């Protein structure tokens, strides 16, 4: 019978199992990243580490007769120093030169090639510092103390350099994995969709014609471009259309049969369909995207790959949304008309205006149409291009963001009229505190400096708009730069009536005007998303009254219409998502800082 007291120390307590698994996962993830880095960008180099000196204690009589041994403990012929001290100083000097060169390259232009050069210099500096730390300095004396202090400095610099190397590894890992995964997702889509729509003419919808020295147009490539363009118009929630991705592929690849990789998978919204009325707006918006794609090839100081990643991930080119589709929020609509629409329609009236570059913050309760408003303003102004940045985007990663912000700013400077919307801006520009992580502080500083440095030509207006539902957590410096602060309140009674009427339009408005008015009074403190959820739940009321046999045999036109009682029953299920304390906090903030107080 084994003794349990002996086996008990080998068991891991239950409260430490989670920490142990997290530690194990982080270790495996780091090993994977290092292996991927070495396979993609590493070079097989062999560093010669100087051998350790052999130290022997000699007697006084033997030491007096022993000849000096060059390279170990004897004096060097050049400067009269022992070989160990001389080698420590030499490695420190070479490491300093490599690290200085790496910092110069790293802090320069943010292209992928320059980052690879910086990594090479960092590796050489690390090798020199590691070689210098292997040299033992055990004797006594002033020069030996200086050598030991040099080794302490090299040890601290080695740790900082390795941290920066880890950041660069993460940057390359994110970019490479995103490109590889996206390329794998895009391999079979054009071929499958081309078989379904092979009978449709491609000339009518071929709006993306990439240009470049390496582009060779072919019939199959043109058909695939046409098909993906139609798909992008049928899905309005996409952050970037597939046609813009394909036009990028023509300028960056010599094989036209393979499409360019997308930056990230897009969300599909099945509620909105492309109609004939939105077709001219879509073609105008698509022509704007194609025009900006052509300008990328003339960028100087920016890696075209990074510019394409930025435009593919955050450039919005989906179907147009107009102000008539949005109920209420008249103050926000008026402000956007003055800032975006009117300057684009009548630029001669705004020429030379010193307030061409404006920043806004839109405090909104959860469920408001905070992103639909700027998208509608760019749809009304056909010359505007809409950039949408959210906390889900890889561009706002704490490590990658500072690498992309300068390219994003330079990219916007060549576009005609650019509108940047930063969703959940409080997650990026929250108030700076003591003990904050260095990456987060660097990201905030980069954004704030970019805000100050955005200087647009009178013909090229740039507008940065931030949306948040926690405006009280914004940093004071960011709030100062956002000079117009527009509060989007919850829909009032009249707005709720319009929203309910629009939601019931597909069901031929089964409720009377008096019932809609009564329902609008009963849904006080409901947001737009709450009303949408309420209408969806009420639409299930007629189906809930049917049994399983009736559901299988009854025709769709035999199901009864939605009644007012269905909404009353759904009010017990769908409750308001915004509490009174939150609404009071928004009102207090708007009273102090809002532009429409």
UniProtKB/Swiss-Prot annotation:
Cell location: Membrane; Cytoplasm, Cytoskeleton, Microtubule organizing center, Centrosome; Cytoplasm, Cytoskeleton
Residues exposed to the Cytoplasmic side: 1-20, 38-597
Domain annotation MIT: ranges: 91-168
InterPro entries tied to this protein: AAA_lid_3, ATPase_AAA_core, ATPase_AAA_CS, MIT_dom, MT-severing_AAA_ATPase, P-loop_NTPase, Spast_Vps4_C, Spastin
Compositional bias per record (Low complexity), positions renumbered to this chain: 232-252
GO process annotations (BP): microtubule severing; positive regulation of microtubule depolymerization; protein hexamerization
EC number in record: 5.6.1.1
Intramembrane segments: 21-37
GO cellular component: centrosome; cytoplasm; membrane; microtubule; microtubule cytoskeleton; spindle
Keywords assigned: ATP-binding, Cytoplasm, Cytoskeleton, Isomerase, Membrane, Microtubule, Nucleotide-binding
Catalysed transformations (reactions): n ATP + n H2O + a microtubule = n ADP + n phosphate + (n+1) alpha/beta tubulin heterodimers
Protein name stated in the entry: Spastin
Subunit text: Homohexamer. The homohexamer is stabilized by ATP-binding. The homohexamer may adopt a ring conformation through which microtubules pass prior to being severed. Interacts with microtubules.
PANTHER family registered for this protein in UniProt: AAA DOMAIN-CONTAINING (PTHR23074), SPASTIN (PTHR23074:SF86)
Main location: membrane
């Amino acid at each position: 019978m084994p003794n349990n007291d002996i086996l008990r120390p080998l068991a891991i307590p239950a409260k430490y199992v989670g920490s142990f698994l997290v530690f194990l996962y982080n270790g495996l993830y780091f090993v994977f990243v290092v292996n991927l880095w070495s396979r993609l960008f590493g070079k097989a180099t062999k560093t010669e580490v100087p051998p350790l000196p052999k130290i022997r204690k000699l007697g006084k009589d033997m030491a007096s007769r022993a000849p000096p041994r060059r390279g170990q403990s004897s004096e060097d012929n050049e400067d009269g120093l022992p070989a160990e001290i001389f080698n420590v100083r030499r490695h420190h000097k070479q490491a300093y030169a490599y690290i200085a060169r790496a910092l110069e390259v790293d802090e320069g232009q943010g292209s992928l090639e320059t980052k690879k050069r910086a990594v090479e210099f960092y590796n050489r500096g690390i090798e020199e510092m590691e070689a210098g730390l292997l040299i033992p300095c055990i004797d006594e004396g002033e020069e030996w103390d200086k050598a030991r202090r040099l080794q302490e400095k090299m040890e601290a610099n080695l740790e900082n350099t390795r941290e920066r190397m880890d950041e660069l590894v993460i940057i390359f890992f994110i970019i490479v994995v995103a490109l590889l995964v996206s390329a794998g997702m895009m391999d079979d889509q054009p071929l499958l969709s081309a078989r379904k729509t092979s009978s449709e003419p491609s000339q009518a919808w071929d709006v993306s014609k990439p240009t470049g020295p390496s582009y060779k147009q072919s019939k199959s490539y043109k058909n695939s471009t046409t098909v993906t363009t139609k798909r992008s118009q049928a899905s309005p929630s996409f952050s970037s259309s597939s046609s813009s991705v394909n036009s990028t592929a023509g300028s960056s690849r010599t094989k036209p049969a393979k499409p360019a990789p997308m930056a990230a998978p897009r969300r599909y919204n099945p509620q909105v369909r492309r109609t004939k009325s939105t077709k001219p707006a879509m073609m105008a918006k698509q022509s704007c995207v194609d025009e900006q794609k052509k300008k990328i090839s003339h960028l100087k100081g920016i890696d075209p790959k990074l510019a394409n990643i930025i435009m593919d991930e955050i450039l919005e080119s989906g179907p147009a949304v107009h102000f008539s589709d949005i109920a209420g929020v008249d103050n926000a609509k008026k402000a956007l008309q003055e800032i975006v629409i009117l300057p684009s329609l009548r630029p001669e009236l705004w020429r030379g205006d010193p307030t061409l570059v404006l920043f806004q913050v839109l405090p909104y309760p959860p469920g408001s149409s905070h992103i639909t408003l700027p998208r509608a303003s760019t749809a009304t102004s056909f010359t505007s291009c809409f950039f949408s940045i959210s906390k889900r985007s890889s561009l706002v990663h704490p490590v990658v963001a500072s690498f992309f912000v300068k390219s994003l700013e330079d990219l916007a400077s060549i576009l005609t009229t650019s509108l940047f919307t930063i969703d959940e801006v409080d997650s990026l520009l929250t108030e700076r505190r003591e003990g904050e992580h260095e990456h987060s502080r660097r990201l905030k500083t980069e954004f704030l400096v970019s805000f100050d440095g955005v200087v647009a030509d009178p013909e090229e207006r740039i507008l940065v708009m931030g949306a948040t539902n926690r405006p009280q957590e914004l940093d004071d410096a960011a709030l100062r730069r956002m000079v117009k602060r527009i509060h989007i309140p919850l829909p009032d009674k009249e707005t709720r009536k319009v929203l309910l009427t629009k939601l019931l339009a597909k069901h031929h408005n089964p409720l009377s005007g008096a019932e809609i008015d009564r329902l609008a009074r009963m849904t006080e403190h409901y947001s737009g998303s709450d009303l949408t959820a309420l209408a969806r739940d009420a639409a299930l009321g007629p189906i809930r009254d049917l049994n399983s046999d009736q559901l299988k045999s009854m025709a769709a036109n035999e199901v009864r219409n939605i009644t007012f009682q269905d909404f009353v029953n759904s009010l017990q299920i769908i409750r308001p998502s915004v509490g009174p304390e939150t609404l009071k906090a928004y009102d207090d903030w708007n009273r102090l800082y809002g532009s429409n107080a």
